[in-house]
Amino acid sequence: MNPIPQLEDLGDLTGRRVLVRTDFNVPLDGGAIVDDLRIKAALPTIKWLVDKGALVTCASHLGRPKGAPDPAFSMEPVRDLLSKLAPGVELLENLRFNPGETSNDPAFVAELVAGFDAYVNDAFGASHRSHASIVGPPKHLPSAAGRLLAREVEILGGLRSNAKRPFIAILGGAKVSDKIGVIEALLDSVDAIIIGGGMAYTFLAAQGHHVGSSLLESDMIDTAKRLLDSDATIHVPHDNSALGPGGKIGDPSAGGEVRQVG
């Protein structure tokens, strides 16, 4: 695997403005952060840059707003926590409030990089997307991988090149969109992939199963179908039932939240 530029490759950062693409897509409940792991995971990169004298501005998406400002997806709760964890570090508003983010609009890229001297990508979970904040800045600014992204790439590279057989990957999590980069990176290297967690329901829906009111990424069903139709061996849960009214177990096709059994 070709080495990717590291933070050290950016040279002297004293007084330089650095745009850091982070993955602060954290779960919220009533405007409160439920799990701050992703924010804390970005701190090694942020603090390294600050220690080197850089002026750091972070940028991230949060949820799936429809290309316009939506208070439900504001970065304000994240900004409040980040100000405590890394004082002086700025955070842009939700990138997806601008339709140019998901369409990779060159005009939005130009707006995004204006005034910055360097770019760091530390958003591994979003790096498979051809979005403006991911693929645009490296065309205009000296760029490097953050500590988190570099570590993920190193681990994946090691798994793919030094795997012992049989090599079976077990992947979970809530969203296919968060794991698609890992899945696609492993497809040609593993003997099988076992899908669990909430994202399994998107794969089940791709197979034509009813998933009731369970977590479902409708816009990822076609992607799940493509993966299932590939030459890779992918296993998804088959022992499912649904919780009906009053918590009773029923037929998944009748609705309710589907649960994996066993």
Go through each PLM region and give its residues:
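Active-site loop-to-helix "anion-binding N-cap" substructures in soluble metabolic enzymes
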Residues: M1-G262
